[in-house]
């Protein structure tokens, strides 16, 4: 019997480890509550976070990256949460873990978007922060996003793996005194900050539809909307982590049915849909057609380059050729980079770029401490569309120069071998291994990237004609799926 109990306990322990390891990802911690992420684990993560920030490993990592070590011996962490139903209890357990490890916590009052959290962390000069959110994931998920000083993201390569290791080891040193909790409301300061990104006098009367998806973005846009001459049709502005109307992920077609319909019903000029934690935002023209994130990167870049001629703009390698063309035409220097917020933010700081944009509708801005904000992007785009004083579809039309496949997933067990096979097949093209494999030819290109969490390869392909795009899309897919 003792052997059976031993085997059962060992099996249960290994299952627990597998569950823990599955939630520590490339950019954040994210899992299903409470099966994968619960209060006990949140407490351990709080202790592990403070332990890591004060470790020699972190100090050495900073030295290698060329950063200052002066903020070590971290004694203060900003913690915020979005509207998810599990957020309150996870936040409380996380805070207890942080304070039990000797650091003070500045707890931001109320529901908070990720952009507002970044603002709080940066403006309060916090040496570190944690945002409790699962971004655009369904309601049963929750998670944590980590930053160090200046709201700089901590990724898998710069700390999340170390935090995971500490959680698994579960051996934390006792501290002489516990930290305290300081509650803080930054809403008034945040409102003043947001108004820096739009000039109300340059916004003409327009009718717009905003679907907040019961996330945090609607309430935060309301801080500024009353200053603008807009007729705003508000949809699902009440924060509700059960997402009673649809998931707060506007990337999926089923979640934008309502806003598309409302735009047409109201004869609106355009539509705006932030995701759950408002780090992303999606735009729709007067016909209810969703506008690709790379097109919006081009338009925002064009506007920002007016005051920053010759500046560098980062765009992700899934973007249309037209993105770089638009940036060059506007007097900027386009820089292609890999997908992922931590990678783009790091690159922006490295090359002093003023803007980074992803096809997935993340927009990162130097004047917003190199972080992504769906709120600020929305304000900038409202002014852009207003100043152009044309139908939004007419503004976007010149950007639809090429034909794109969209992202297509294929199940592949040996992802690395398949990408090498593609590189060999298309060796006459210009090959880049920046993020997966991207191969450019004169009249078409494709990128194949591996999923971080699943046995999937993701294909994006573009060509100078629809016929060529369809031909090459089918050709490459057949090779991937063979």
Set out the residue ranges of the language-model regions.
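N-terminal small/polar loop signature for handling phosphorylated ligands or for N-terminal nucleophile
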Residues: 66-67, 71, 76-142, 195, ...
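An N-terminal, well-structured beta->alpha segment
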Residues: 17-96, 100-101, 183-206
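Proline/glycine-rich low-complexity loops and linkers
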Residues: 109, 161-192, 196, 286-359, ...
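Gly/Ser/Thr-enriched, mixed-charge loops and adjacent short helices
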Residues: 142-266
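Glycine-rich phosphate-binding loop
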Residues: 127-135, 139-141, 263-285, 290, ...
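Phosphate-binding and adjacent anionic-ligand microenvironments
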Residues: 306-482
């Amino acid at each position: 019997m003792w052997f059976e109990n031993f085997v059962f306990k060992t099996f249960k322990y290994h299952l627990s480890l597998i569950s823990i390891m599955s939630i520590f990802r490339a950019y954040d911690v994210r899992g299903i509550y409470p099966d994968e992420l619960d209060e006990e684990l949140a407490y351990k993560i709080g202790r592990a976070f403070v332990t890591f920030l004060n470790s020699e490993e972190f100090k050495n990592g900073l030295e290698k990256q060329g950063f200052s070590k002066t903020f070590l011996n971290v004694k203060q962490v900003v913690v915020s949460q979005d509207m998810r139903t599990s957020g309150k209890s996870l936040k409380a357990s996380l805070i207890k873990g942080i304070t039990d490890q000797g650091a003070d916590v500045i707890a931001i009052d109320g529901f908070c978007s990720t952009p507002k959290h970044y603002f709080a962390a940066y403006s309060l000069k916090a040496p570190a922060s944690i945002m409790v959110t699962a971004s655009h994931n369904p309601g049963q998920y929750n998670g944590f996003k980590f930053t160090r000083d200046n709201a700089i993201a901590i990724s898998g390569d710069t700390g999340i793996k170390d935090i995971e290791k500490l959680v698994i080891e579960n051996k934390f040193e006792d501290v002489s005194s516990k930290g305290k909790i300081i509650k803080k409301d930054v809403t008034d300061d945040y409102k003043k900050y947001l108004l820096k990104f739009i000039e109300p006098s340059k916004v003409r009367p327009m009718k717009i539809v905003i679907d907040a998806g019961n996330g945090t973005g609607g309430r935060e846009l309301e801080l500024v909307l009353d200053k603008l001459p807009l007729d705003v049709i508000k949809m699902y502005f009440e924060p509700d982590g059960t997402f009673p109307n649809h998931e707060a992920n506007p990337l999926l077609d089923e979640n934008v049915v309502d806003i598309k319909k409302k735009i047409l019903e109201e004869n609106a000029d355009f539509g705006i849909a932030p995701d759950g934690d408002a780090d992303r935002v999606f735009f729709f023209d007067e016909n209810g057609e969703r506008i690709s994130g790379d097109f919006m990167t081009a338009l925002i870049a064009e506007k920002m380059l007016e005051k920053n001629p010759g500046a560098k703009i980062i765009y992700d390698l899934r973007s249309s050729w037209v993105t770089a063309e638009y940036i060059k035409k506007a007097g900027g220097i386009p820089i292609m980079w890999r997908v992922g917020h931590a990678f783009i933010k790091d690159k922006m700081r490295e090359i002093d770029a003023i803007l980074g944009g992803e096809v997935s509708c993340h927009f990162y801005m130097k004047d917003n401490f190199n972080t992504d904000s769906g709120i600020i992007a929305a304000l900038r785009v409202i002014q852009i569309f207003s100043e152009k004083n044309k139908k939004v579809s007419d503004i976007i039309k010149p950007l639809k120069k090429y034909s794109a496949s969209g992202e297509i997933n294929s199940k592949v067990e040996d992802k690395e071998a398949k990408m090498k096979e593609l590189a060999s097949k298309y060796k006459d093209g210009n090959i880049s291994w920046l993020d997966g494999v991207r191969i450019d030819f004169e009249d078409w290109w494709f990128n194949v990237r591996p999923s971080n969490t699943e046995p999937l390869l993701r294909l994006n392909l573009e060509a100078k004609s629809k016929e060529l795009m369809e031909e090459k899309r089918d050709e490459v897919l057949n090779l991937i799926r063979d």
